[in-house]
Amino acid sequence: MLRHLRWALLWAGVILWLCLIPGKSLPEWHWFALLDLDKLVHAGMFFVLAVLLAQAFRNGGAPARYVLWAILISAAYGIGTEFMQGLEALGRRSDINDMIANSLGALAAGVFANWRERKGREIVPFGFLR
C-alpha cells in the first residue's frame, strides 16, 4: 500500500511546505489578492491530494469506501494545515475560508473520482499512477 501512496505523500509534503512557509518569506502579490485566486489555489491543492489518495487506495486494494476516506483525509489535512498556520512562530494566520476551500476541493475530487469510477476509468487520467 505504501508504494501506491508515494505520490499522495509527496504531494502532501509539498502542501505542508507551501502552507507553513513563514509569513515574512511570502512574496507580496498584489495582483493575486485582486483576483482572489487564493481560494481556488487552496481548493486545487486539496483536490489533487484527494484524487491521488483515491487512486492509491484503489490500486492498493483499500476498503470499498476508499473515495470517502480520500475526501475525509484530505479535508482533515487541509483543516490541520490551516490550524498550523495559526502558530505564532510562522507569522501567518488561520483562515476559516481557506479551511472551507480546502474541504470543497477534497469534496470535488470525490465527485470526480466517483464519476471516473462509474465510467470504468482510472481515477487519475492518462495512466500516470499505474
Name what the model sees in each region.
Residues 1-96, 103-130:
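Bulky hydrophobic segments
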